């Protein structure tokens, strides 16, 4: 086939040039200092680009080259021409990596996980979204409960709704298994004014970009409890896919 000898010649020349460059960068035989370098806290030791000596991994936006490699556990790669003014190489996030990190644990793109018993989350393109598993986060309390509140029941993951009458006496009973509270209240008069009541806004459904936060409130024209939603924006999403680390959320 025409052009094949030229292609083979170019490929051979490229391999020879590459081997010469690698020979200049990597010392032969491999010799390393007796004591490994002292890295800053949280920075691991990794093998250099020659696979010879251990060096401190370079972190996000730090300069990098053949011998000083980026931290692979954080999905960082050395990007040439990404330094100031388009010169030099720096460590940036790998755009092809859709994994996410939550509470120090890494999950694959599309993997589902439970950071706690109350939510089910899914790793999605470098971020993650979560759905509530407790019915109290979705189901409203009874309509005849003027001041509902949620209490944490010993031995149970999900809190439960109870009616708080305030100054009005309420009948409470304690279950034998633990101090579970349930209140029986007298229905309020139809002419009595219903006080405004609402829970705090819940966390945003996303870690970056637009999401939805919910709360339970009776602040509407019918003065009835309903689930209200509003848009939320925790932070803008990075142009490159990144690892989401939400260590304080759960």
Curated annotation (Swiss-Prot):
Source species of the chain: Rattus norvegicus (Rat)
SMART domains the UniProt entry points to: IB, TSP1, VWC
GO terms for MF: heparin binding; integrin binding
Keyword Signal attached: yes
Disulfides per UniProt: 22-50, 26-52, 32-53, 39-56, 64-78, 70-100
A Gene Ontology cellular-component term: extracellular matrix
PANTHER family per UniProt: CCN FAMILY MEMBER 5 (PTHR11348:SF22), CONNECTIVE TISSUE GROWTH FACTOR-RELATED (PTHR11348)
Subcellular location: Secreted
Family as reported in the entry's similarity comment: Belongs to the CCN family.
Designated name of the protein: CCN family member 5
Keywords per UniProt: Cell adhesion, Disulfide bond, Glycoprotein, Secreted, Signal
Native organism taxonomy: Eukaryota, Metazoa, Chordata, Craniata, Vertebrata
Domain IGFBP N-terminal as annotated: residue spans: 24-103
BP terms from Gene Ontology: cell adhesion; negative regulation of cell population proliferation; positive regulation of cell differentiation; regulation of cell growth; signal transduction
